[in-house]
């Protein structure tokens, strides 16, 4: 059974201010959710893994999901 994880952290790009983020992913383990985050940020923002600092990874209940797309997947 897949779980939902909320990952918070800081992403920094050269010459720009750091960006704080909070993302939610559906995965089996926290490591899988982290790998999805690295893959997404690398492709979308061209950020290397070493420039992403993870502050917290927590498992959340389906009621606590804030991402509208993930919420539809969970409640369907």
UniProtKB/Swiss-Prot annotation:
GO terms for cellular component: ribonucleoprotein complex; ribosome. It comes from the Archaea. The keyword Membrane does not apply. GO terms for molecular function: large ribosomal subunit rRNA binding; structural constituent of ribosome. The keyword Chaperone does not apply. InterPro entries: Ribosomal_eL20, Ribosomal_eL20_dom. Keywords: Ribonucleoprotein, Ribosomal protein, RNA-binding, rRNA-binding. Belongs to the eukaryotic ribosomal protein eL20 family. Part of the 50S ribosomal subunit. Binds 23S rRNA. This is Large ribosomal subunit protein eL20. It comes from Methanocaldococcus jannaschii (strain ATCC 43067 / DSM 2661 / JAL-1 / JCM 10045 / NBRC 100440). The lineage of its organism: Archaea, Methanobacteriati, Methanobacteriota, Methanomada group, Methanococci.
